[in-house]
């Protein structure tokens, strides 16, 4: 949830700069990660659980793209980019491990 809160703070900054298109995109993908992880907790079976985690992983990958774009275009400082990207990378690693474990337990 902390990552999503940081993304929402970034969205607020971007909207103050009237960058609504990219703000909306990173807002959707960045907050969707946690929402899909939360949904996975109440999945209707193993396949649904894996599906929700894979969706969260896709959203984390998309968020990484938006973070890089914002940094390269000057909207995100190197310090802010590194902080958010490190957290996003950690989320991706956790999701990959969780999906792989769940798939292994599926057999």
Locate predicted features.
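Short, C-terminally biased terminal segments at protein or domain edges
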Residues: 1-107
């Amino acid at each position: 949830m902390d990552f999503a809160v940081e993304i929402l703070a970034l969205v607020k900054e971007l909207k103050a700069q009237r960058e609504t298109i990219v703000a909306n995109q990173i807002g959707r993908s960045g907050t969707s990660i946690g929402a899909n992880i939360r949904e996975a907790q109440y999945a209707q079976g193993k396949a649904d659980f894996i599906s929700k985690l894979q969706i969260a992983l896709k959203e984390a990958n998309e968020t990484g793209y938006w973070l890089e774009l914002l940094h390269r275009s000057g909207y995100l400082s190197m310090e802010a980019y590194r902080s958010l990207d490190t957290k996003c990378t950690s989320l991706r690693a956790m999701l990959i491990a969780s999906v792989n474990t769940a798939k292994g337990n599926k057999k």
